[in-house]
Amino acid sequence: MDWLQDLLWNPNSVAHIVFLYAFVVAAGVYLGKIKIFGVSLGVTFVLFAGILMGHFGFTGDTHILHFIREFGLILFVFCIGLQVGPSFFSSFKKGGMTLNMLAVGIVVLNIAVAMALYFILGGRIELPMMVGILYGAVTNTPGLGAAQEALNQLSYSGPQIALGYACAYPLGVVGIIGSIIAVRYIFRINFAKEEENWNQETDGTHHKPHLMSLEVHNEAIYGKTLGTISSFLGRPFVCSRIRKNGHVSIPNHGTILEQNDQLFVVCSEEDSDAIVAFIGREVQVDWEKQDMPMVSRRILVTKPEINGKKLGMLNFRSMYNVNITRVNRSGVDLFANPNLILQVGDRVMVVGSEDAVERVASVLGNSLKRLNEPNIITLFVGIFLGILCGSLPIAFPGMPTPVKLGLAGGPLVVAILIGRFGHKLHLVTYTTQSANLMIREIGIVLFLASVGIEAGANFVDTVIHGDGLLYVGCGFLITIIPLLIIGVIARSYYKINYFMLMGLIAGSNTDPPALAYSNQATGSDAPAVGYSTVYPLSMFLRILAGQMILLLMM
């Protein structure tokens, strides 16, 4: 039975480490699916499974646990950054600026409440432990990792701050969802009215491609080429088909328009009225009845060399006599403006003869198999640059130690930049949603399992004989006070839609369980929009905040 003894208890055995992690992750993920009052902890339960195993003496070599913890965290934050990168900078436009400002308010108030409790209690809770409680209260795991990284820089040897995190986390989830419910009852929210208001708001802000058939009835443009008209009008549109004297063909910039010519036009909704008024009138045309065999087909961009190129640079109209009318990216239709930058994973609508469309397909790739192949080089180039970025010391006046983004902040920043600007460096940033989610989940469960196993030895003693209940109470106050204050301000002063506010609260705390609750409460996508708008900045600030507190005050 020596083999079993070695498998279960030898902390230096590779088999023991793998066996322990496999059990902790499997048990944690399974138990995390159990719903309590309609809310499940999800993969976060892996932390508690790790604590349980650590409490009973199952552990591993400290250096191995540390490596797995940090590598898991790197994978997690990098995949998050890669996913939110394209929307990070655009989230500051229009209403996104207000939402992000409110999210910053929540982050600042969380820190203010935590520091107030720290001074009120007169140092009964050590500063590193209070930071752990802060991150448990706001359910932000990457921030905990960044704080631990900062403590490593300071050679901290006190109690595991993950104990404070684990104590505060459960009521943190409850408090976030509770604040969402509280705001609903404070303002007596009518779900049906909120959904109607949201639909009215989004109808006016979504710039989808507008398709229409027009008949030429403006004497001023008779005999003019399509290119001349487009330049004079100054509003971008695509004319994919023209019916002239009963014959349907594909027009180009040199096509001359005459009276009663019929055009199939694609443009943005806000430009449609001006284009109709300038060309003639809108008519109903059956474009299926044609004497020239033409097809409309969505073609997948899969060739890396197309990544980052402007649509107009490819000259499809002049080279292949086809028109591209719209581009679908991540489920959203975009107007095919010549300045639109194509990315791997885009689906372009091509109109032309079947032979020409096939030639365009060969240029763009149109290979689903190629799209499903993992772009490993982008992942590891990004991690390499992220660690380099995270290791650079940034000196601030008055701070005893330079700040570093660390193993959490560095990869996150680089991933956001690659997600947004990677196509300009011809880096293929496209990853299937399932692949991104798989890597992300593997990363977070490895991190949580490591933190739990390391903290487990002292957890029960801390809760029963130590200040565990005090940690829980402090965590709940850190959670609930800022959310109620900002929730009331957002609703009463800024008139934020309640469903959007749900996403704001969940996103500012980077809390998936709260988002899941919000999505269940409404059929609208408003919570997801609010969540994704504030998530990148909130995550970035959460990761930096703990480091700044520790480096400034220790």
From Swiss-Prot:
Residues 198-281, 282-366 form the RCK C-terminal domain. GO terms for molecular function: monoatomic cation transmembrane transporter activity. Keywords: Cell membrane, Membrane, Repeat, Transmembrane, Transmembrane helix, Transport. GO terms for cellular component: plasma membrane. InterPro entries: AAE_transporter, RCK_C, RCK_C_sf, YidE_YbjL. Its main location: membrane. It is found in: Cell membrane. It is a multi-pass membrane protein. PROSITE patterns: RCK_C. SUPFAM superfamilies: TrkA C-terminal domain-like. The keyword Cell membrane applies. Pfam families: Asp-Al_Ex, TrkA_C. The chain crosses the membrane at residues 13-31, 36-58, 73-92, 99-121, 161-183, 376-395, 405-422, 442-464, 468-490. Signal peptide: none annotated. One of its GO terms (biological process) is potassium ion transport. The keyword Transmembrane applies. Belongs to the AAE transporter (TC 2.A.81) family. This is Uncharacterized transporter BF3802. It comes from Bacteroides fragilis (strain YCH46).
